[in-house]
Amino acid sequence: MRHGKAGRKLNRTASHRKAMFANMAASLIEHEQIVTTLPKAKEIRPIVEKLVTLGKRGDLHARRQAISQIRDVAVVSKLFDAIASRYATRNGGYLRIMKAGFRQGDNAPLAVIEFVDRDVDAKGAKDRARVAAEAEAAEAA
């Protein structure tokens, strides 16, 4: 019997789930908005909210705990520097989930999960920087 077992399995092994949530959390913190399926969005929300609370704590131990969970030092530094200061006065509720219709291939329910006071310019910033660098290199050549 499965009494008291919280969380969805999402048809994955435990290690696959852990890796997927780490990658999704890193992407969400980096871009501040991602599109995923509704069950995955509902599962990732408490993970990222706990990471933001770690960022608000701000000490070395909290930073190491965050690194051990999402395994990307650059994303953790953004979490602790930019995001933690943005939500310093807010007690929880850092994320919102909005339903976004159904996926065409398998009709899976989609959702947009984003930070409540998100930086609109953060989404795709890395790609814009790469495209600009490639354009400069093409002009110089």
UniProtKB/Swiss-Prot annotation:
GO terms for biological process: translation. The keyword Ribosomal protein applies. GO terms for molecular function: structural constituent of ribosome. SUPFAM superfamilies: Prokaryotic ribosomal protein L17 (SSF64263). One of its GO terms (cellular component) is cytosolic large ribosomal subunit. Keywords: Ribonucleoprotein, Ribosomal protein. Gene3D superfamilies: Ribosomal protein L17. It comes from the Bacteria. Disulfide bonds: none annotated. NCBIfam families: L17. Part of the 50S ribosomal subunit. Contacts protein L32. Belongs to the bacterial ribosomal protein bL17 family. HAMAP family: Ribosomal_bL17 (MF_01368). This is Large ribosomal subunit protein bL17. It comes from Sinorhizobium fredii (strain NBRC 101917 / NGR234). The lineage of its organism: Bacteria, Pseudomonadati, Pseudomonadota, Alphaproteobacteria, Hyphomicrobiales.
